[in-house]
């Protein structure tokens, strides 16, 4: 059963969480203040074309991947890719001059533009349901970590939810409902909750979630990784109608980053390999590709274009 109003679990932490796909999957990077925050390990973003037989995306053995193309030329942290609805550009986080800002890459022209340029740090860019703003996890000047929005037309940013902190990651369910990864207090586990912007009420879902929250294609559900034990991580589905969770499939060992294709296939990466599975068909993970591109190793985050014809893959560059 869900537990409502877990406001007692939220406090302003002196340490905050910065997302780093290049750390071990369970790791978190504390940063007492933006000025003293350690820089996450470097990472690059690649885009890869995805083709399927007869345009179906329900069978992994019918998929073919093109050659990866690196879209980030800045040596440092380039992470958290997010495809815009038209599939023509990608938002991502990049740390430059010790500050994390949001950038936008145009796939057709290859041009990169800066979206945010603030003294604070912004992470996890996501287009809001109104399609006029992007929401971000913002590390404020005092280290507070909350959800903000930036207008796409360049207007001033504003808080989305004042009282919820510290936010690690988020997913828009609809125009007034959010799934939120909340950092636990000292000695307490991180937890996952739903938050209603209209009622200002929270609904507790589970402890120890993974950082990736995704809508499941063509279902009234969203997915998350449940870290049940150090050696047992499962991808679960939360049913928005029944308010219950059910296991879909075990995650690859030590991996918490994943993505859905529109046809219902799950993707996960490990080292230089990309794996796929159709969990609703009761199948197991199979290797889809082993990339041989120099520098493409340590795959972590994966994003899928709206049509499912292109992937954005985060990888660790060669040392």
Write out the residue ranges for each language-model feature.
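Bacterial N-terminal signal peptides that target proteins for export
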Residues: 2-13
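Sec/Tat signal peptide C-region and signal peptidase I cleavage site
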Residues: 23-27
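Bacterial N-terminal signal peptides
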Residues: 12-22
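Sequence signature of WD/YWTD-type beta-propeller architectures
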Residues: 28-319
